[in-house]
Amino acid sequence: MLTTPQHYNAETTREKALQSLSAAKSDSAYDANNHIRQDQAMMALDVSEPFGGSMEKAASAVKAKVLIVVALQDHTVTPGPAMEFGKAIRAELLTVNNECGHQLTSCENDRVVGAVAEFLQQ
């Protein structure tokens, strides 16, 4: 689930959920390995690894200006670590607190695009 449970429940009727399940069962293009590989990629990404596991050393290696965009209700990639690292590198931070969760850019596209454009103009 890429959105919050509240958003999913508000947007998904019982009939829609059953149709989605039926479609997934009959969709030969659906491959559960895709989700497994995405999870493995997220778990393997450790910016501190080249620095002996030190987040402080990793942060000190960042020289660029950084904008971090997080959805506070993201249940797929929790925002805490990105926010902590952002603080360590003095990144600009855009936090959005809505029920779209991991689908933040779908729900708040104009806001995110505007923030990125403004950041790039600096």
Outline where the language-model segments fall:
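Catalytic histidine-centered segment of alpha/beta-hydrolase-like enzymes
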Residues: 99-113
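Alpha/beta-hydrolase
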Residues: 1-64, 76
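Non-transmembrane alpha-helical segments in soluble domains
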Residues: 36-39, 86, 117
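Acidic beta-to-alpha connecting loop that harbors the catalytic carboxylate
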Residues: 72-74, 98-101
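C-terminal alpha-helix
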Residues: 111, 115-122
